[in-house]
From Swiss-Prot:
Location of the protein in the cell: Nucleus speckle; Nucleus, Cajal body
First-listed, main subcellular location of the protein, grouped into a coarse class: nucleus
BP terms from Gene Ontology: apoptotic process; mRNA processing; RNA splicing
Taxonomy, superkingdom: Eukaryota
Listed name of the protein: Survival of motor neuron-related-splicing factor 30
Naturally occurring in which organism (per UniProt): Mus musculus (Mouse)
PROSITE patterns recorded: TUDOR
CDD domains: Tudor_SPF30
A matching Pfam family: SMN_Tudor
Gene Ontology cellular component list: Cajal body; cytoplasm; nuclear speck; spliceosomal complex
Gene3D superfamilies attached to this UniProt entry: 2.30.30.140
Keyword Nucleus: yes
Keywords in alphabetical order: Acetylation, Apoptosis, mRNA processing, mRNA splicing, Nucleus, Phosphoprotein, Spliceosome
Tudor domain segment(s): 72-132
Amino acid sequence: MSEDLAKQLASYKAQLQQVEAALSGNGENEDLLKLKKDLQEVIELTKDLLSTQPSETLASSDSFASTQPTHSWKVGDKCMAVWSEDGQCYEAEIEEIDEENGTAAITFAVYGNAEVTPLLNLKPVEEGRKAKEDSGNKPMSKKEMIAQQREYKKKKALKKAQRIKELEQEREDQKVKWQQFNNRAYSKNKKGQVKRSIFASPESVTGKVGVGTCGIADKPMTQYQDTSKYNVRHLMPQ
């Protein structure tokens, strides 16, 4: 996934350079200015996602390697688990166990919410109830804090990925607007100074996308990439 994001980042940067080149000759074009702003935002979001992935993976592996579960769990067991929404402990049932990653899919008895949580965070029902009664408002343990922090980072990354998806859609809308503007300008201009959208898709699989009228020579065009396959789940940290 990091490799995919890196490729996307390179593509966004190349597109930004082309838009900036187009703006050098048409600096007041609102569509180009909006596209430049969107590209700058999506570049920053993609950088954030790339920077958070290695640290989360490392934190996950370190915490799992240093703390193995002391209880032998099996599917169908009742347990006490921390709900990520409020950090409180509730009774749950184990639906599935992933021994390789040290996690369990559980369903909370009260609300019926399903969640995946580290096995090391699960406690036997009686032990968990007693700990909950004794602790009162006692701060969460280090293990619980790590689990909660990981969940928070995943949710934050999901929001960033969703924003990238929204920006991709906005760019498609901007492409349509540019094409409409292009057609109107060409119909009024007999000399045909504006003939083709800088956002136009290639006419063949070997075609390229780029600014042909930017006045920059000897610079390669950006390879056309279909970004529709990159959805939110592709961008989420593992």
